[in-house]
């Protein structure tokens, strides 16, 4: 049954009249906006309102944001749901001229956009503009967003903390924002109040994001009067004042780790006693959004005890947009950690709501984006394990990071003829449309965006869409296969991926399904089977994306020419993404060949790597030619990696020089079965680290060679070193700075060169360098800094080889050992194998503490070697387990310990063939590449009712005693 509140045609007419009287400038509420849109649609169609009246009803059956249209009755679960129903009705009138049945109950309860304030000069033109905010929230409402998070003070001293820019707290008159007058402060508060209230009028829940309550170490304060003693009481009073002055603020998002500016040992007390208390004491319900990254022990308990509604969020794919699913495994702090834990009683919901943060701040900063299939796949993952939804960072969300001076737009002043928008966010209409409409209704018809392409580009609309869709795959794949830093410090839209040795050293961020260059080489050398994608497949993807984009752009250009304004402002982005795809296709292969050469001394791989980096440089030169003078030279969207493509040219040029040097070393010395680079001490690389890997910690060491310093003393575990320490001196090369290794620095001055000969060790006398080897006889080449070499033949004893330095003074840059025996023939590349049919009936429900069997059917299985199950609790802190089964009967038995009531079960299959390659199921290219089975405590059935007592023959009948 539906409980309905009828809004009569009189209400409809009255509301429309009221809106007309107001000039249509503002919406009194979501329902009024929806009604106004319906009226505009009737007018556009020339239909009389009195003959097309509608009835609106509240429904208790639909969710709050749901709606249905039946005849001329529109039902909604709330005013926002009714607004969505009216917007759908308006679209139907425009498209069809009449209403058609429709019903949507959104699977994602929260659908949010997040925006950051970072630059006073750039924000001056829109932040205080009421027309801007009305247009923005109208766009969000049309696209079915229901949340807007405006974040202040994100890793910057700008507006940190923001409270003194809004209010003066009588108890703390000494706390002031520097250079802000009372009039400016009042204007700031009034603007915040207007933004929050206007959001509400369009059905948008406004969230106030406060990420720093004090500046971080090394920043210049923009606020005076704060001390460690008063910051807590001041924050309590100020936040409370802001919330009371701005009733449209529905929730407050807090960052609570060290990046908040609050020292770790004070964070729990600060938030518990002041910030959370301010929310509780405001006098109305305000939701707490807690960013859960690196919380101190006790902070979650404090939030749960704050007696306000609590939401907890974490990152979907680090601080970038990768593939359309949370990675099966990644750095735990850059994913959902253990936040999807369920309460002890499985029928009880969590004490908090969980939602996903889709960070685009690292990757999708400037260029246009829109791929409906990607969005459909992503939004299907958002409800995983009861999550409430998502918020996402659109392009330009951090424009002007760090309050850098200067005005700049998407294009340079000379290219303003390409500007087809009034507000810059209008340029990204497809991004907003797809993420909003498809998260609200994943079954939305493609005509919603295809009609818009046709309206904007006419007969070329389909080709512009195809170009955009294919170009949009490029950045997501770069993030998935090559993410040098999960933080937003590297900008893949303009970054060439770092120096070639760094590129080859970086792991994929989707390492469960993509092999690193090192892993791929070892798999091939050791004959180890793996279904993971290789660089060859990745490069093929990049070149396919580029080709499809190029072809669609050419077709659109033939129709639109150079005179179409929106096309002229769209095509450059597509061209940039095409070239980025070509570049990374080349660099993927260069890195793959280079790592293979380092393992095998295969000279064809070395020359192939040289060819690929040369090709990559040519592509980057095209990028510079295309973008120079087109996009601004001083673009800043993050704390590092600012500037322009032309600022990065030195890096691919250095790659070419690096490979030239490697080829010259090969020609001069031949293969290095064991290679040692003599120089100063360096740090050991940390396995699986993204900042302390080999290319960073040993950037002054020739790749493929082991670093040797005077302190490198032989031990069995290391397998090489000096027999005795002492008497040795190093002539060291400096490390290449991290920012140059990763191609972040704009003016690199310390790029690597001459690594083997540029540093050295010198000594006097016959010191011995010992190496554990496989083989008997070796030629030892002691390389001098001038490039000449002392050669000798040495023999190993029991797997140990001693190379004696000459008597007298000596100085060497390195040591190469060449086995007299021919090198082993490596495993050939796997031949292609036809993919078999794979079937699995995934259980929807698993009972906790009970064993379960999972069956995978594979047929035909004649080319399948084994089937492997990977499984763990849905917890990024848990370790993946694996078990194998024959393909003829791939049945896996999980024990009772594997079905923990606190966690749902996450699992996927790897099918390995006889060629050493294979397939994953589910397929990462088509679906979320793992299953999530709900684990629930089995509730025993209620006991049967007691049996009726047997009839008593001596008892009198109901009518009384028998006479």
Language-model features, listed with the residues they occupy:
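Feature activates predominantly on carbohydrate-active enzymes
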Residues: 29-37, 41, 62-66, 70-229, ...
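Catalytic-core regions of glycoside hydrolase
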Residues: 48, 94-96, 146, 158-162, ...
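Mature N-terminal, pre-catalytic/accessory segment of carbohydrate-active enzymes
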Residues: 26-154, 310, 317, 535-671, ...
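C-terminal non-catalytic alpha-helical accessory regions
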Residues: 394, 398-400, 404-651, 655-666
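Compositionally biased, intrinsically disordered or flexible polar/acidic segments
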Residues: 669-822
């Amino acid at each position: 049954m539906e409980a309905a509140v009828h809004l009569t045609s009189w209400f409809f007419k009255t509301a429309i009249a009221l809106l007309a009287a107001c000039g249509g400038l503002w919406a009194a509420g979501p329902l009024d906006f929806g009604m106004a849109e319906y009226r505009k649609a009737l007018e556009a169609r020339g239909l009389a309102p009195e003959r097309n009246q509608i009835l609106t009803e509240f429904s208790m059956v639909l969710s709050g944001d749901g709606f249905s249209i039946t005849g001329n009755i529109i039902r909604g679960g709330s005013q926002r749901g009714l607004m969505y129903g009216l917007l759908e009705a308006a679209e139907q009138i425009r498209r069809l001229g009449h209403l058609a049945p429709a019903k949507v109950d959104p699977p994602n309860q929260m659908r949010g956009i997040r925006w950051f304030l970072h630059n006073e000069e750039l924000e001056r033109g829109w932040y205080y503009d009421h027309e801007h905010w009305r247009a923005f929230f109208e766009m969000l409402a049309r696209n079915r967003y229901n949340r807007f998070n405006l974040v202040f003070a994100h890793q910057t001293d700008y507006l940190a903390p923001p409270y003194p820019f809004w209010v003066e707290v009588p108890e703390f008159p000494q706390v002031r924002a520097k250079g802000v007058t009372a009039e400016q402060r009042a204007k700031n508060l009034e603007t915040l109040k207007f933004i929050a209230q206007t959001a509400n009028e369009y059905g948008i829940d406004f969230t106030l994001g406060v990420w720093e309550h004090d500046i971080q170490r090394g920043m210049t304060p923009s606020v005076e009067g704060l001390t460690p003693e008063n910051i807590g009481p001041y924050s309590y009073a100020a936040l409370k004042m802001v919330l009371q002055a701005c009733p449209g603020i529905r929730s407050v998002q807090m960052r609570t780790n060290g990046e908040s500016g609050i020292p770790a040992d004070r964070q729990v007390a600060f938030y518990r006693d002041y910030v959370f208390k301010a929310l509780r004491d405001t006098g109305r319900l305000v939701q707490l959004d807690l960013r859960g990254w690196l919380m101190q022990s006790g902070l979650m308990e404090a939030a749960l005890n704050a007696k306000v509604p609590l939401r907890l969020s974490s990152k979907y794919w680090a601080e970038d947009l990768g593939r359309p699913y949370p990675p099966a495994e990644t750095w735990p702090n850059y994913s959902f950690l253990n936040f999807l834990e369920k309460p002890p009683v499985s029928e009880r919901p969590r004490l908090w709501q969980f939602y996903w943060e889709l960070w685009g701040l690292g990757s999708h900063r400037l260029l246009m984006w829109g791929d409906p299939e990607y969005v459909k796949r992503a939004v299907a993952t958002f409800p995983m394990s009861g999550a409430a939804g998502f918020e996402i960072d659109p392009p330009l969300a951090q424009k002007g990071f760090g309050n850098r001076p200067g005005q700049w737009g998407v294009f340079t002043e000379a290219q303003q003829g390409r500007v087809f928008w009034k507000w810059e966010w209008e340029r990204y209409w497809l991004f907003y449309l797809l993420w909003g409409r498809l998260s609200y209704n994943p079954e939305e018809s493609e005509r919603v965006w295809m009609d818009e392409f046709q309206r904007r580009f006419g007969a070329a609309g389909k080709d512009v869409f195809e170009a955009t869709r294919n170009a949009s795959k490029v950045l997501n794949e770069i993030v998935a296969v090559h993410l040098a830093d999960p933080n937003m410090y590297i900008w893949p839209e303009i970054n060439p991926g770092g120096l070639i040795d760094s590129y080859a050293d970086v792991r994929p961020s989707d390492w469960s399904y993509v092999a690193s260059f090192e892993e791929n080489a070892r798999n091939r050398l050791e004959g180890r089977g793996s279904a993971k994608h290789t660089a060859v497949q990745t490069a093929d993807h990049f070149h396919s994306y580029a080709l499809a984009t190029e072809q669609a752009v050419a077709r659109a250009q033939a129709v639109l020419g150079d005179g179409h304004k929106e096309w002229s402002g769209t095509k450059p982005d597509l061209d940039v993404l095409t070239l980025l795809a070509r570049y990374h296709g080349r660099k993927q292969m260069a890195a793959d060949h280079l790592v293979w050469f380092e393992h095998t001394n295969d000279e064809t791989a070395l020359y192939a790597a040289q060819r690929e980096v040369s090709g990559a440089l040519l592509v980057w030169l095209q990028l510079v030619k295309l973008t120079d003078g087109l996009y601004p030279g001083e673009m800043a969207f993050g704390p590092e990696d600012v500037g322009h493509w032309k600022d990065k040219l030195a890096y691919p040029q250095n790659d070419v020089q690096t490979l030239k040097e490697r080829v010259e070393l090969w020609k001069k010395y031949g293969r290095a079965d064991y290679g040692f680079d003599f120089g100063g001490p360096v740090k050991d690389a940390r396995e699986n680290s993204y900042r302390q890997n080999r290319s960073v910690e040993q950037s002054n060491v020739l790749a493929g060679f082991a670093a040797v310093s005077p302190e490198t003393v032989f031990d069995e575990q290391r397998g090489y070193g000096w027999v005795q320490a002492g008497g040795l001196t190093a002539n060291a090369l400096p490390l290449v700075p991290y920012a140059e290794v990763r191609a972040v620095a704009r003016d690199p001055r310390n790029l690597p060169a001459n690594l083997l000969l540029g540093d050295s060790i010198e000594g006097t006398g016959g010191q011995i360098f010992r190496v554990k080897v496989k083989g008997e006889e070796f030629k030892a080449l002691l390389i001098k800094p001038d490039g000449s070499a002392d050669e000798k033949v040495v023999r190993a004893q029991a797997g140990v080889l001693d190379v004696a330095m000459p008597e007298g003074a000596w100085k060497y840059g390195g040591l190469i050992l060449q086995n007299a025996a021919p090198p082993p023939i490596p495993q050939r590349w796997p031949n292609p194998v036809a993919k078999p049919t794979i079937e699995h009936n995934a259980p929807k429900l698993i009972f906790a503490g009970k064993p379960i069997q999972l069956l995978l059917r594979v047929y035909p299985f004649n080319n399948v070697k084994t089937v492997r199950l990977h499984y763990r609790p849905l917890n990024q802190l848990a370790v993946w387990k694996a078990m194998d089964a024959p393909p003829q009967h791939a049945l896996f038995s999980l024990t009772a310990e594997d079905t923990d009531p606190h966690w749902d079960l996450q699992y996927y299959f790897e099918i390995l063939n006889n060629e050493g390659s294979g397939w994953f199921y589910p397929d990462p290219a088509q679906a979320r590449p793992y299953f999530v089975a709900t684990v629930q405590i089995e509730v025993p059935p209620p006991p049967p009712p007691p049996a009726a007592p047997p009839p008593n023959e001596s008892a009198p009948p109901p009518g009384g005693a028998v006479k």
